[in-house]
Amino acid sequence: MSFTVTKTAPAVITPSEPTPSGHILPLSFFDRLPFLRVFLVDMIMVYGHGDQPAKVIKEAVAKALVHYYPLAGRLTTDTDDGELSVACTGEGVWFVEATADCRMEDVNYLQVEPLMIPKEQILPSHPEGVDPYTLPFMIQVTQFRCGGFTFATRANHAVFDGIGAGQIKVAIGEMARGLKHPTVKPVWCRDVIRKPIPSQISATEPHDTDLSSIPDLKFTNNQTNIECCSFDLSLDHINHLKDHFAKEVGKICSVFDVIAAKLWQSRTRAIGLQPQTEVSLTFLLNIRQVVLHNELPPDGGYYGNCLVPLINKAPSGQIANAPLFEIVRLIKEAKDDLLSKDSASLIGEMPPYKKPSYADLSIVDWRRLGLYEADFGWGGPMFLVPLNEHTVTSCSTYLFKSPVASKKDVRLVTYCIVKEHLEAFRDEMNDFT
């Protein structure tokens, strides 16, 4: 059964009050990294109900842009140094209003892939004749027959990271609920994160590994032969393993540490690479308080890119056979080591992009980005639907809050297993559900 989304005439939302204009704001070294400046991040947030959400959100965006006025500008390289920057033009944010001829439950709340409504119908499309990479932020609000709605965004990753996205969307929600100012005051200060001098750049080269036993991911039009699956992980069981780690090691670990260790081991066992083949687990660490500790107020506010990838590497046999607490220790020690470095060293730690292989795995924790706190007056989102990140990193996994409000469990969604390994992977993960 097919469903139709009807988009009304799009509009440009400008700040509701005069804002600084006519000047150029620099982006940081992180913001200007090549793989971020050409990365448009698509996200759908699913809400259960709302009264005229498009009207409310449109007005809230105009108010939020007074505080986040760079988002009303345009990305440009027409500067003295030719570097990517934000021109504060005040032109506004592209906003699309739409209606769907179905209920949320008819399309499974957009939780099953492939989506029952093509993502292009839910996401905002850029104006004809406009380069989408010049637009920092676009929005589409789609109302469903049941009263639910989606708040879908397309954002240029060069302007803000996941934490920044959460901060901005929370601010829009606060404006929608009648606040005069965002709870967290936005901070720009991109010039603090400068390009490192050559001596600060890590010279670490990728470790040689036996590629002959690693399956081809078969990239075709940004798609792979990777299967999608999800698990609802028991927080009681995770807390039991945290207690076991504390008893064995004498230190405290996080829910994330335990899930990441279990995921890495389960997948490594399921794919069955040669014991000496190197496998990796990558996740992002927020380094705001290290790099910007002299610039930020106590409540933060920096919304530029300030997440660095931490790549954990080990032989397949070690990860498959070690006690789980040892893998937790490996992950935790790597985090502690990275965060103990000084600002200059951290800025130089950004590894070059490389095409991922089946031996590589990444995990993103969407629970801690602030997105669940984006409340436009009717409560936070029921579901988050990231649409394109797994097509970039291939073997990706995501942590979400449980969709059942009364439960404290964690939902893990994975795009990291080919079909022939899926059953073994599920068997390994089942004792966490």
Curated annotation (Swiss-Prot):
GO molecular function terms noted in the UniProt entry: acyltransferase activity
The keyword Cell cycle belongs to this UniProt entry's keyword annotation: no
Active site: H157, D375
Organ and tissue specificity: Expressed in young cromes.
Pathway note: Flavonoid metabolism
EC id: 2.3.1.-
UniProt enzyme class: transferase
Catalysis: reaction(s): myricetin 3-O-[beta-D-glucosyl-(1->2)-alpha-L-rhamnoside] + (E)-caffeoyl-CoA = myricetin 3-O-[(6-O-(E)-caffeoyl-beta-D-glucosyl)-(1->2)-alpha-L-rhamnoside] + CoA
InterPro entries: CAT-like_dom_sf, Plant_acyltransferase
Keywords of the record: Acyltransferase, Transferase
Functional description taken from the UniProt entry: Caffeoyltransferase involved in montbretin A (MbA) biosynthesis. Catalyzes the caffeoylation of myricetin 3-O-beta-D-glucosyl 1,2-alpha-L-rhamnoside (MRG) to produce myricetin 3-O-(6'-O-caffeoyl)-beta-D-glucosyl 1,2-alpha-L-rhamnoside (mini-MbA), a precursor of MbA. Mini-MbA and MbA are potent inhibitors of human pancreatic alpha-amylase and are being developed as drug candidates to treat type-2 diabetes. In vitro, is able to catalyze the caffeoylation of quercetin 3-O-sophoroside (QGG), although QGG may not be a physiological substrate in vivo.
Family designation: Belongs to the plant acyltransferase family.
Record's protein name: Myricetin 3-O-glucosyl 1,2-rhamnoside 6'-O-caffeoyltransferase AT2
Lineage, opening ranks: Eukaryota, Viridiplantae, Streptophyta, Embryophyta, Tracheophyta
Gene name of the encoded protein: AT2
